[in-house]
Design a protein with these regions (language model features):
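Short Lys/Arg-enriched helix C-cap and helix-to-coil transition segments
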Residues: 35-41
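Basic Lys/Arg-rich amphipathic helical interaction modules
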Residues: 1-25, 32, 45-74
Length: 74
């Protein structure tokens, strides 16, 4: 089985244990890049891994604490 290079918000939520609404909030705060395909939003697996490592001891529900991925400019 090949590893996915991108996941939907729902797949990322299942994979990480982070709630779908929390992931959507993080995306709306422009903390990580996403890919839009029609109405579907994809998150690259590599970006998700980097984001989680960067925010290891962070409350992801608190925008003031969340560290956006370096180099990600909206």
């Amino acid at each position: 089985m090949t590893e996915k290079i991108a996941m939907t918000v729902e797949e990322a939520a299942d994979f990480t244990g982070i709630g779908r609404n929390t992931l959507r909030q993080l995306i709306s705060w422009k903390t990580m890049p996403t890919i839009k395909v029609g109405r579907k939003v994809l998150i690259k697996t590599q970006d998700l891994d980097r984001f989680l490592e960067l925010n290891r001891n962070t409350d992801l529900r608190n925008q003031a604490e969340v560290i956006p991925l370096k180099g990600y400019v909206n």
